[in-house]
């Protein structure tokens, strides 16, 4: 009988319906309810992208397809997928409890975020390992980052190339690629967090692979807190690149995310497009990885490499 390995797929989570927004936001705010104005602002953003984010559906599809792919690629062990979310059910702890109940003794934990940071990956894996420690007889093997995975870089190289190939030579000369990820509080830099460096590396790999000479790194979706967040913000960067260098075609690659969701559909497709419209420039944004076969193959490689290194 094949050994069963847990596949713990972790992600941020998103409201399933409009009624979930308040409790979801309250969880993000560590139990503090948002003000009516804050709640109205967030609800308005969801309504602007069609009422609710497609993220919940995409995340589940990614996780299910990954489980299937891993069991197709090898016959040595049987992977059982468990989905654990940071801010809405099924919570990370729920997933770990389900694994324990099913008699899983070893699990590979994959966060659907390519870059490592203490705020994201470390906190997800930490929560999973803490719960496993309480239950006993369950070891969680966490994957720190996978932004260097060849198939991940290749996905974005192909996506960016696809857009540039549709441009005339004259347009290409005045086009710029903005590679971005979710901003985090600036204090992580002083603590030696590798997150900003990893995004810079990712941008270099993609620009080189796609043969794009003009590119810049930006940050997006910063939180509304008194602390400073990492910049430049993608909207400010867009204006600056237009004013300084006269770029009038902007290609946004939000590589810190793996699916179409609020931060991409609103912060990029709405807010950044408002800026490009304002300055009379063209807006482009490649399709996100979502549950594409190429991306699922990338994640499967990541999991199999981790399994080889720890078991």
Swiss-Prot record:
<dbReference type="GO" id="GO:0004325">
    <property type="term" value="F:ferrochelatase activity"/>
</dbReference>
<feature type="binding site">
    <location>
        <begin position="45"/>
        <end position="46"/>
    </location>
    <ligand>
        <name>Fe-coproporphyrin III</name>
    </ligand>
</feature>
<keyword id="KW-0408">Iron</keyword>
<feature type="binding site">
    <location>
        <position position="124"/>
    </location>
    <ligand>
        <name>Fe-coproporphyrin III</name>
    </ligand>
</feature>
<feature type="binding site">
    <location>
        <position position="29"/>
    </location>
    <ligand>
        <name>Fe-coproporphyrin III</name>
    </ligand>
</feature>
<dbReference type="InterPro" id="IPR033644">
    <property type="entry name" value="Ferrochelatase_C"/>
</dbReference>
<feature type="binding site" description="axial binding residue">
    <location>
        <position position="12"/>
    </location>
    <ligand>
        <name>Fe-coproporphyrin III</name>
    </ligand>
</feature>
<keyword id="KW-0350">Heme biosynthesis</keyword>
<protein>
    <recommendedName>
        <fullName>Coproporphyrin III ferrochelatase</fullName>
        <ecNumber>4.99.1.9</ecNumber>
    </recommendedName>
</protein>
<feature type="binding site">
    <location>
        <position position="182"/>
    </location>
    <ligand>
        <name>Fe(2+)</name>
    </ligand>
</feature>
<keyword id="KW-0627">Porphyrin biosynthesis</keyword>
<feature type="binding site">
    <location>
        <position position="263"/>
    </location>
    <ligand>
        <name>Fe(2+)</name>
    </ligand>
</feature>
<keyword id="KW-0456">Lyase</keyword>
<dbReference type="Pfam" id="PF00762">
    <property type="entry name" value="Ferrochelatase"/>
</dbReference>
<comment type="similarity">
    <text>Belongs to the ferrochelatase family.</text>
</comment>
<comment type="pathway">
    <text>Porphyrin-containing compound metabolism; protoheme biosynthesis.</text>
</comment>
<dbReference type="GO" id="GO:0006783">
    <property type="term" value="P:heme biosynthetic process"/>
</dbReference>
<dbReference type="InterPro" id="IPR019772">
    <property type="entry name" value="Ferrochelatase_AS"/>
</dbReference>
<feature type="binding site">
    <location>
        <position position="53"/>
    </location>
    <ligand>
        <name>Fe-coproporphyrin III</name>
    </ligand>
</feature>
<comment type="function">
    <text>Involved in coproporphyrin-dependent heme b biosynthesis. Catalyzes the insertion of ferrous iron into coproporphyrin III to form Fe-coproporphyrin III.</text>
</comment>
<dbReference type="InterPro" id="IPR033659">
    <property type="entry name" value="Ferrochelatase_N"/>
</dbReference>
<dbReference type="InterPro" id="IPR001015">
    <property type="entry name" value="Ferrochelatase"/>
</dbReference>
<dbReference type="GO" id="GO:0046872">
    <property type="term" value="F:metal ion binding"/>
</dbReference>
<keyword id="KW-0963">Cytoplasm</keyword>
<keyword id="KW-0479">Metal-binding</keyword>
<dbReference type="GO" id="GO:0005737">
    <property type="term" value="C:cytoplasm"/>
</dbReference>
């Amino acid at each position: 009988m094949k050994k069963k390995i847990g596949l713990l797929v972790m992600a941020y989570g998103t409201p399933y319906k409009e009624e979930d927004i308040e409790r979801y936001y309250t969880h993000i705010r560590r139990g503090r309810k948002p003000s009516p104005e804050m709640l109205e602002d967030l609800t308005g953003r969801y309504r602007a992208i069609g009422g609710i984010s497609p993220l919940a559906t995409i995340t589940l599809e990614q996780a299910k397809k990954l489980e299937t792919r891993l069991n197709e690629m090898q016959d040595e062990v049987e992977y059982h997928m468990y989905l654990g979310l940071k801010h809405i059910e099924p919570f990370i702890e729920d997933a770990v409890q389900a694994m324990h109940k099913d008699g899983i003794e070893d699990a590979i934990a994959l966060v659907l975020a390519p870059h490592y940071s203490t705020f994201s990956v470390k906190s997800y894996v930490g929560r999973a390992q803490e719960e496993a420690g309480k239950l006993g007889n369950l070891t969680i093997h966490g994957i720190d980052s996978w932004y260097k995975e060849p198939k991940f870089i290749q996905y974005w190289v192909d996506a960016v190339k696809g857009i540039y190939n549709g441009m005339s030579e004259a347009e290409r000369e005045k086009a710029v690629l903005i590679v971005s990820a979710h901003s985090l509080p600036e204090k992580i830099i002083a603590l030696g967090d590798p997150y900003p460096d990893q995004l810079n590396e990712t941008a270099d790999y993609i620009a080189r692979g796609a043969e794009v000479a003009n590119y810049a790194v930006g940050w997006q979706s910063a939180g509304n807190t008194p602390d400073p967040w990492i910049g430049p913000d993608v909207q400010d960067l867009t204006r600056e690149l237009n004013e300084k260098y006269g770029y009038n075609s902007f290609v946004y690659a939000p590589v810190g995310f793996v699916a179409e969701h609020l931060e991409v559909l609103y912060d990029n497709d709405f807010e950044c497009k408002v800026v490009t419209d304002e300055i009379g420039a063209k807006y482009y944004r490649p399709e996100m990885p979502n549950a594409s076969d190429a991306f699922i193959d990338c994640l499967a490689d990541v999991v199999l490499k981790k399994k080889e290194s720890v078991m």
